[in-house]
Amino acid sequence: MIPSATYRIQFRNGMTFDRAAALAPYLKDLGISHLYASPIFTATSGSTHGYDITDPNEIDPAIGGREGFDRMVKALRNAQIGLILDIVPNHMATSLENRWWRDVIEQGKNSAWAHYFDIDWTRPVTLPFLGDTFEIGRASCRERV
């Protein structure tokens, strides 16, 4: 079915699969043909958007996991509403919560996951992490110079 009217759901921040499932009858009454879902894969702890994936093989337990996803899909089918997923395959978090990234940091180019990341191995990998907000980090750097 070709989408004719989509409704976007931003999962996280209290929006779960079960809450989206409960909206299905209302969306049907509005004439919505498809639910357009924000990323659903496991993201960094506290992610507000889901574009910082840490496990592309797991539906995020924080928004209902696989079981919640299946309940939502069933509710959408019952309402004859399609589902469009924003899968963001090019958005993997550079966080140690991401086991692929953590392995690359630990094993370097010998990591089984090294080819998944665009890393120039001809020079040392630089990871510029601030220990605080940008403003505080910048002020701290000025104090040391």
Roles of regions detected by a PLM:
Residues M1-R144:
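Catalytic cores of glycan-processing enzymes that make or break glycosidic bonds
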